[in-house]
Amino acid sequence: MRDKIVVKGAKVHNLKNVDLQIPRDKFVVFTGLSGSGKSSLAFDTLYAEGQRRYVESLSAYARQFLGQMDKPDVEYIEGLSPAISIDQKTTSKNPRSTVGTVTEIYDYLRLLYARVGKPHCPKCGKEIQQQTVDQMIDKILELPERTRIQVLAPIIKGRKGEHIKVIENIIKGGYVRARIDGEIIDLQEESVKLEKNKKHTIEAVIDRIIIKSDIRSRLADSIEIALKLSEGVVIINVIDKEDILFSENFACIDCGISIDEISPRLFSFNSPFGKCDYCDGLGTLLEIDEKLVIPNKSKSILEGGILPWANTVTNEDSWTFSILKALSKKYNFSLNTPIGELDEEIYNMLLYGIKGERIKVRYKKDGRAVDFNHTFEGLMNTLKRRYMETNSNYMKDNIENYMSDNFCPKCKGARLKPEALAVTLGEKNIFEFCKMSIREELRFLSELMLSNKNKIISNQILKEIESRLQFLIDVGLDYLDLARMAGTLSGGEAQRIRLATQIGSSLVGVLYILDEPSIGLHQRDNDRLIATLKRLRDLGNTLIVVEHDEDTMRAADYIVDIGPGAGEHGGEIVAAGDLKTVMETEGSLTGQYLVGKKKIDIPINRRKSNGKSIIVKEAKENNLKNVDVEFPLGTFTCITGVSGSGKSTLINEILYKGLNKKLNNSKEHPGLHKEILGIENIDKIINIDQSPIGRTPRSNPATYTGVFDGIREVFSNTTESKMRGYKPGRFSFNVKGGRCEACKGDGIIKIEMQFLSDVYVPCEICKGKRYNRETLEVKYKNKNISEILDMTVEESVDFFKNIPKIKNKLQTLMDVGLGYVRLGQPSTQLSGGEAQRIKLASELSKRSTGKTLYILDEPTTGLHIDDVNRLISIIQRLVDGGNTAIIIEHNLDVIKSADYIIDLGPEGGAKGGEVIGIGTPEEISVNIDSYTGHYLKKML
């Protein structure tokens, strides 16, 4: 096998005919400025070609489901292995996806609980035993005399297929009837054809009996036959009543409860046999929230105190006003009384209605007053009913403004049926086990006391679970729990989970391509991550890691520095070799930082607070230990601490959601805390995260920053536009008129691939230009609107230099290092770091109020050291305007540049959630309890 991967003539995106040789079975780092072409080379060239070759090796039948994969723009690649990409973008937002299911640990857990778990009665909690035939008969004979019953033997339960053989065997056994999918079928008279792809339940009718005192012997024979046929389970179908289930295996005689066979699917919240029926296995329910319906009880009904009625209650001709007027007359209350001062009975009546009563409502329609006798179901019930009945997405979205997620009242968030939760192992059910931290779970399993028989049964299962838990600990995720929803994980956490899963698979000879695995990881945990990456390499794999972390670069076998600049100014190999080679390469910006020629300077002065602050009192969400935290205003404050110490909980779940609820009436519930003081000191809160600036290719930097409005105005003021009567709307690709109607102004056509990701292809009519021919005939300085959208920010700053309104907004994009981005670049093609900097640029271009609080969660994701330097300057500019920046960060260059640090810890998970230190970087660096301080000391 070749010892190198040879890339010849790569031209994907901004790559400039790149030739590169990468050593195989080594740990290789790709680095360079944000937008220099690292991802284009790693993901869009190497990974894409590896995937394409793999797909081409499949049969034509398999390929038809995967679609045609385009060949990357590269002359050739030699020595390429099958490629696996572990990036940060593929986190599942499906509420059914958890850490346990993603890592497949939950599958092994289900098997473990099914094989060695102890079943208990879900009602009384007693450990349940097997039932004898005599016990079953005694229970049946308690039914009233002359009750008609059928003895059924369940043969197939919820399985797909035509089940022809099963039905034939029932007939051969001499049974003439069967209950199929709940319906009794006469097998002699009807030919049964079942749909192959649907799930079916088949139960043979063994006997039909009328309860009498002398049927004991016959009943015993029938039950024994049924038990034999169905492997220990019998169903007594009481005509016109509910079935009674008996099991030779597990039943509580006291409560009369029998449990079906304990199989792995009983513990699956995605299976109809295991999931909680009330919440459908989600653990939460979206319900109308009284606090969102009435956020301010000091307002009266006529003042809009009840939000869903706020727009219609002031219109005296509306139905809402008419019915409320009738209610106020009948129950003697005023619509001008503050809601909080209404009698409890009136308050409840408005929300939950009046049962069994009708009220006389006078309603004006078309100038005529009409009297109705009408029921009133209450606002909460009306909203719930409309939400369930409507097919309108607009209506659903509107009602969802008054809804919030709450724990399911039946399963209390556990997602499973009571029968599943009644099975324990070491005194814990499967949900209680999953709620422990991964480190605690590993300890629990190592201390588990099992009988010799159960040890033999569970030996292999436990090995699989324990090894996977250990891999998660190795990548710094010991603080997570298996019940955590995958959608709530950060990009870095999700990526490291997939990394741990890959180590568990022990593949050899694979090309792994990773996207910044160090994101979200404290310096303390970085060594373990690097050791894990080396372990993956030592198995016999090639690792290409797109990374900016200095420790990772120093640990790599080979570094490829791509640049020298970003976008149009990048796409070349600046340096390639070991650490020493890169450090000695003159043109390498990375090398200059590694060798110390360039560095991020420590601020000469640190700001003092403006004397005002925001204080979070008694924060106790997740692992926070009832802490009080004061955030000084007018400063740049960093929130630090090891992974899982409570940073995101404190800032995103409590501070941001709490302030957003107060300032913007957000429907999101903040995490548990007593109160937030000092809210009057700010007027705006903005969370500048790395989520996309838009969900579709229709959104782009020009539309997001608002610069496109000015550009459209310029085009509408040209002589040609005035002659044709074109207004600014003519140059919008979102409305009819000037856009290409074939692609509705997208420039591309979306092809839905059903169970695969959607595929986008260029529009054949406008050739991707978005506009129709007439619109493109209008030019400003010899450029049409499509050509403007194709310009980079850098080109457009010069192009619009005489129009301050446009130039100033574009200049802020230049200031944040996005000169290489095209104005019309679809948001779907922007990295998280680029999206975040576009949001920062948009904020910089606005007039500062001096009372804005900015929150950023790990803004250095995807940024080179030089980009980080620029980011710090932007944050300092925002704070210089009197605003406040609160930043969650592990990057020591950002931390050393802050005015204040709030350090949480000391550990992650249950051992975290305390404030370890508050102060300047210099003060934190001498705090002996602070891991952050230990690493920070070397930087100051």
Swiss-Prot record:
Gene Ontology MF term list: ATP binding; ATP hydrolysis activity; DNA binding; excinuclease ABC activity; zinc ion binding
Any one GO biological process: nucleotide-excision repair
Alphabetized UniProt keyword annotations: ATP-binding, Cytoplasm, DNA damage, DNA excision, DNA repair, DNA-binding, Excision nuclease, Metal-binding, Nucleotide-binding, Repeat, SOS response, Zinc, Zinc-finger
Zinc finger (C4-type): 252-279, 740-766
Positions of ATP binding: 32-39, 641-648
Residue ranges occupied by any ABC transporter domain in the UniProt entry: 309-589, 609-937
KW Isomerase (keyword) present: no
Cellular localization per UniProt: Cytoplasm
Highest taxon above the source species: Bacteria
Pfam families, per database record: UvrA_DNA-bind (PF17755), UvrA_inter (PF17760)
Transmembrane segments: none
GO CC entries: cytoplasm; excinuclease repair complex
InterPro entries linked: ABC_transporter-like_ATP-bd (IPR003439), ABC_transporter-like_CS (IPR017871), ATP_grasp_subdomain_1 (IPR013815), P-loop_NTPase (IPR027417), UvrA (IPR004602), UvrA_DNA-bd (IPR041552), UvrA_inter (IPR041102)
Description of how the protein assembles with itself and partners: Forms a heterotetramer with UvrB during the search for lesions.
Family indicated by similarity: Belongs to the ABC transporter superfamily. UvrA family.
Role played: The UvrABC repair system catalyzes the recognition and processing of DNA lesions. UvrA is an ATPase and a DNA-binding protein. A damage recognition complex composed of 2 UvrA and 2 UvrB subunits scans DNA for abnormalities. When the presence of a lesion has been verified by UvrB, the UvrA molecules dissociate.
Record's protein name: UvrABC system protein A
Organism of provenance: Clostridium tetani (strain Massachusetts / E88)
